[in-house]
Each structure stands twice: as C-alpha cells, then as structure tokens.
C-alpha cells in the first residue's frame, strides 16, 4: 500500500545505514518495484565502505554485467585503509584489554581521571582519542557495527562533553546498537543522547530542533522493539513540549506512531486520559497530516461516526502490516481499536442490548456475551451484564472534586503548551535538510 508508505519521509532523517532494514522490509512486502529498491540500495551504498554488499546488489541488479572496475578498486583501497587503521589502533586497544584498565573503567565515572590513569600507566596521549574515533567510524562505514560500538564506548568514557566528536560518537553508538538489535543498550544510548541534546547550551534553537527531529526518527527503532518503548514514546512525543513542537513543526507524520503507541498501550486508565490529549493534537494537525490511523481516532472520538471508524479500522490493517515499525503491533491495535469502538458506543447509549452488540461485532449473542464478560473480568471494561434482559449497562464512576480539579489543571497546562508551541511554530523556518555529522550525507531513495 504505497499510498500510505512513509519510508521516503522517514529515511530523510536517518543515517543511511539505518535505511537498509527499511528497504529490506519493503522488498519482502513487494510494495515497490524490486529494481527501484535495488537502485536505492546501490545509491545508499555508494557513500559507505560496504563494498562487498554493493557488489552483491550490483550483481542482482545487472546480472549480465561485470562488476565495475571502480568497485574493485574501491575494495582494494578500503582494505588498505582498514589495515593501516588497525595498525594505528592496535596498541590503544591493548591498553583497554588490560585487566587493571578494565577494572578502572568499571569503577570510575570520571573521564578525566581515567584519562590520567591511562596516561600514567600506558603513556596514553590526546591524539589516541582521534585515532580511536576514526577507527570506530571506519568500522561503522564497513558495516562492522559491533566493532564500532566497542570503540565508541571506549571513546565516550574518555572524552569530555565539550569534545568536538562527543555528540557524533553518541549518534554512532546509538546507530550501531540499533543495527545489532541490542535494544537495552540502544535505550540507554537514546536516553544519554537525548539528555545531551536537551542540556546543550551551545547549540542554536534551530540546531536543537534539527537534532530532536533526528532523535525522534531514530527512536522509532528502539521504542517499537523495547518492552517499555510504547510507554516511553508517549511520554517523550506527547508530554515533552520540545519534542511535540518538533513533531508539529518538522515531522507531523510521526503522529502515526504516537497514535499507535497510545492505542496499543496496556494501561487502560492511563490510555483514556492520554487519548484526550492525543485527540487535541490530531485535530490541530489534521490539516498537515492524516492517515487511516489518525483518522480512526478522529472518527471515533471527535465525530462519533462509528461506521466511518469501522471503515478506517479496515484501512488501518493495511497500513500497519506494511509499516516497518508497526507490523508487530497489528494484533494489539485491532483488538484495542475494536474495544474502543465498543466502549464508546456503549458510553453514548449507556444501555444496549447484547443482540445489537453481537450484530455490530459480527458475533453470535452468546459469543458477544462471553467476550464482554472477559473484558469485565480483566478490568478492561467498566460495565455490568443483565442476563435476564440481555442488556449491557455501562458503569458511571463518580469523579471526586479533587480529581476534577487535577484533570482541569492538566488540561489548562496542556493548552498552554500548545499555545506556546504554535507561537514557536510560526516563528520557526527551519531547514529540513541538515543531517547529524555522523551520517554526513542525506539519505533517501
């Protein structure tokens, strides 16, 4: 379903290495012509040192042609550079392999103290840090992400936050962990990178906006694979004003992922409050971005149009199954979305016959009653069943005055944030083309 595919938009904010998994996914889904995807891969590979991979793609794309001489020559050059960097880095790596050094690294959090220790014990010098960084980056460009992550870790613990390569090394470490699918380590690196960006007083507002936009896109890999990711994405994208502002200003298409995270959230009570805040954002941004997932929420919670909501839900299935980040959320999304339709319908009507519900849910009355009983039993639905009359009666929990004040205060706070963001949004004329230094090139196909 190419109409709703966001790969080209998302790839614009990713390092080129992170785009490869998306292209592999599209290839399996057969959304685009395979030759177009192979051309895209070859274009991405042209700026990396993954020459063997490029040769394989070239063979698949042009089976009748010889491998270009430029690729063969590049391979020789890359191998030569790798050997040279290995020779320069080997003595440095041996220092880190020393048991005493390992113990010192584990016991101290002070990079300067560790640097002084290495200088005293192993004659470590400042230029070694640049060598280590160059070697890590070269390993990354060759597709050796485990090596890159290891050397970037050594680099990170030694350099101060003011080092010219400090921020770039955090981007590289995060990318490496993502590409190795080490989600715990990636979550730690994501948190560290976010703190660095948020606490950076040197960057201009425009640079910070661009960095946050990149972080938002890279975080999708982590949030939709880490066990706590769907909670964290809501907290970051919806309730951190600077990141919500970045989404509204630079990348409203991210609302698809925020909406999916809210709908599939397992905390029922939290989800209801979050939905209210999400609906406000979706309404506000509906003129800049909409797809079946955001429209489903709008149909159900703004227009209370149940027929349109059912129609959009069917479209959501196609969107989810063809989205690299959301395909694993399909079952949770459909189950919870049906529950939302059912719950909203019942809340409007307060009392409804089971036979009517069965008809709406395409079930027999007995199946519908069992389904509702399970929802009540699992505390996912506040309702009672009158078996004699064959009715479902929705609960009407009284809200304390204190809770009402809290909710109204939250609402006022949220509206204030939105107002401030709209002012910033009108003032911001950010370029969407700048990339983190680690990537060095725009990506896309």
Swiss-Prot record:
Record's subcellular location: Cytoplasm; Nucleus
Subunit structure: Component of the eukaryotic translation initiation factor 3 (eIF-3) complex, which is composed of 13 subunits: eif3a, eif3b, eif3c, eif3d, eif3e, eif3f, eif3g, eif3h, eif3i, eif3j, eif3k, eif3l and eif3m.
GO CC terms in record: eukaryotic 43S preinitiation complex; eukaryotic 48S preinitiation complex; eukaryotic translation initiation factor 3 complex; eukaryotic translation initiation factor 3 complex, eIF3e; nucleus
SMART domains: eIF3_N, PINT
GO molecular-function term, one example from the UniProt record: translation initiation factor activity
The protein, known as: Eukaryotic translation initiation factor 3 subunit E
Similarity comment: Belongs to the eIF-3 subunit E family.
Function comment: Component of the eukaryotic translation initiation factor 3 (eIF-3) complex, which is involved in protein synthesis of a specialized repertoire of mRNAs and, together with other initiation factors, stimulates binding of mRNA and methionyl-tRNAi to the 40S ribosome. The eIF-3 complex specifically targets and initiates translation of a subset of mRNAs involved in cell proliferation.
Highest taxon above the source species: Eukaryota
């Amino acid at each position: 379903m190419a109409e709703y595919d966001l790969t080209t938009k998302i790839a614009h904010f990713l390092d080129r290495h992170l785009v490869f998994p998306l292209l592999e996914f599209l290839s399996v889904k057969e959304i685009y012509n395979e030759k177009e995807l192979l051309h895209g891969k070859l274009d991405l590979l042209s700026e990396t040192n993954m020459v063997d991979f490029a040769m394989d793609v070239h063979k698949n794309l042009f089976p009748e042609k010889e491998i270009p001489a430029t690729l063969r020559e590049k391979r020789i050059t890359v191998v030569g550079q790798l050997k040279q960097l290995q020779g320069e880095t080997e003595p440095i790596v041996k220092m880190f392999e020393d048991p005493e050094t390992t113990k010192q690294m584990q016991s101290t959090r002070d990079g300067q103290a560790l640097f002084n220790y290495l200088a005293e014990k192993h004659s470590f010098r400042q230029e070694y840090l640049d060598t280590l960084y160059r070697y890590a980056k070269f390993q990354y460009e060759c597709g050796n992400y485990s090596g890159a992550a290891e050397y970037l870790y050594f680099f990170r613990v030694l350099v101060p936050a003011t080092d010219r390569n400090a921020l770039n090394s955090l981007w590289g470490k995060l990318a490496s962990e993502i590409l190795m699918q080490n989600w715990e380590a990636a979550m730690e690196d994501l948190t560290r990178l976010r703190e660095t960006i948020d606490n950076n007083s040197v960057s201009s507002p425009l640079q910070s906006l661009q960095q946050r936009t990149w972080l938002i896109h890279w975080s999708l890999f982590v949030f939709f694979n880490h066990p706590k990711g769907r909670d964290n994405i809501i907290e970051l994208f919806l309730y951190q004003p600077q990141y919500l502002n970045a989404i509204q200003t630079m990348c409203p298409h991210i609302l698809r992922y925020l909406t999916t995270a809210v709908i599939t959230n397992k905390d029922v009570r939290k989800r209801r409050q979050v939905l209210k805040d999400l609906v406000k954002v979706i309404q506000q941004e509906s003129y800049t971005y909409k797809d079946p997932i955001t429209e489903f929420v709008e149909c159900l919670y703004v227009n209370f149009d149940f027929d349109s909501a059912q129609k959009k839900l069917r479209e959501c299935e196609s969107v989810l199954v063809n989205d690299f980040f959301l395909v694993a959320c399909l079952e949770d999304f459909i189950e919870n979305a049906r529950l939302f339709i059912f719950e909203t319908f019942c809340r409007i009507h307060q009392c409804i016959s089971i036979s009517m519900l069965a008809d709406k849910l395409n079930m027999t009355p007995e199946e519908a009653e069992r389904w509702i009983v399970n929802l009540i039993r699992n505390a996912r639905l506040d309702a009672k069943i009158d078996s004699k009359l064959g009715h479902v009666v929705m609960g009407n929990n009284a809200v304390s005055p204190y809770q009402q004040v809290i909710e109204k205060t939250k609402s006022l706070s949220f509206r204030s944030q939105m107002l401030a963001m709209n002012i910033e949004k009108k003032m911001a004329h950010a370029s969407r083309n700048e990339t983190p230094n680690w990537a060095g090139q725009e990506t896309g196909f």
